[in-house]
Amino acid sequence: MKWKQQLDGMQAYKPGKPIEEVQREYGLKEVIKLASNENPFGCSPKVTAYLQNNAVNHALYPDGYAQNLRTAVANHLGVQETQLLFGNGSDDIIAIITRALLYPGVNTIMADLSFSQYWHNAEIEGAEIRKIPCVEGAHDLEAMAAAIDDQTAVIWVCSPNNPTGVVIPDTALRAFLAKVPNDVLVVLDEAYIEYVTHPEHKDTLPIIDQYPNVLLLRTFSKAYGLASFRVGYAIGQPTIIEKLDPVRGPFNNTSLSQAVAAIALSDQEYIEACREANEHGKKQYVEFCEKHNLKYFPSDTNFIFFDTKADSDVIFQELMKKGFIVRSGNALGLPGFIRVTIGTEAQNAALLVQLDNVLKEQGVFA
């Protein structure tokens, strides 16, 4: 086989352990998964009601243009329908972007502590990858701007950042964009945008008019609680969407996925309720970290990334034995840290009791 050389040594994306596997491995009846930043409250009740009372014709291909969902999102955001591109999750759109713009001879710039699919897909396409170290969990935008040259094709900016949760203030973001040449695509990944409460954050939609080389990425997998339906979308100038759309696979969103995403979008009261509950849950973790003097990054997401002062793989394993799945910082680029999805109040309280016990067992504190 004449494989791409860059595939040598590459591994598939490794998600958090599934609940069923942990139950079998440790003989547990109940396992709480706080590893993949799903919405612990699930999807809107309107979606649940729809799924109970409606069916689709499974023999027919879905609408390849996602017209009903396209109209719903365009109306919700106040953009043109031609400014939208839909994917099988935002991961799909990341792959579309890299396939369209990256190849041997060009480079792509990103933070070193960010979403792994940026460099994973860039590596497959053979592009040079320039990882810029984060500063206190935040993108070093000045260093990223300094790394741009004539061969730079795509810059990835994750805000709020995964796995740190740090959001980029509006003034800093705009100052950075002003330094980026017009022929370089800036992908602003906003998978957690619905959770942002930072006072210096502003609506980013106007940015795509001021900076036509910016593409926003959003998803229904996080706040909307539709991770299993795999619906992500991009917002940008029609000229960018027109170039990316031919790279998109046909029928990449199922009929059911399109329907439930549109319904979920219509229930903004539910999103607000989830955001408020998330803020309350976040305080539980912040109080724990401050009580035990554990460093954490200020999060504008539904997860928190903090230092355990121990081997995070050990903490991960010990919590799993007790029925809690989190993500080890060893797998995310910062050993010693763990990333925990903010769950319900009861889930958070239960995990923190067990984490307290585990950290005492590891000698982190008495």
Curated annotation (Swiss-Prot):
Pathway: Amino-acid biosynthesis; L-histidine biosynthesis; L-histidine from 5-phospho-alpha-D-ribose 1-diphosphate: step 7/9. The modification N6-(pyridoxal phosphate)lysine is found at K222. Its EC number is 2.6.1.9. It comes from the Bacteria. Its cofactor is pyridoxal 5'-phosphate. It catalyses: L-histidinol phosphate + 2-oxoglutarate = 3-(imidazol-4-yl)-2-oxopropyl phosphate + L-glutamate. Keywords: Amino-acid biosynthesis, Aminotransferase, Histidine biosynthesis, Pyridoxal phosphate, Transferase. One of its GO terms (biological process) is L-histidine biosynthetic process. GO terms for molecular function: histidinol-phosphate transaminase activity; pyridoxal phosphate binding. It holds the Pfam family Aminotran_1_2. It is an enzyme of class 2 (transferase). Homodimer. Belongs to the class-II pyridoxal-phosphate-dependent aminotransferase family. Histidinol-phosphate aminotransferase subfamily. This is Histidinol-phosphate aminotransferase. It comes from Lysinibacillus sphaericus (strain C3-41). The gene is hisC.
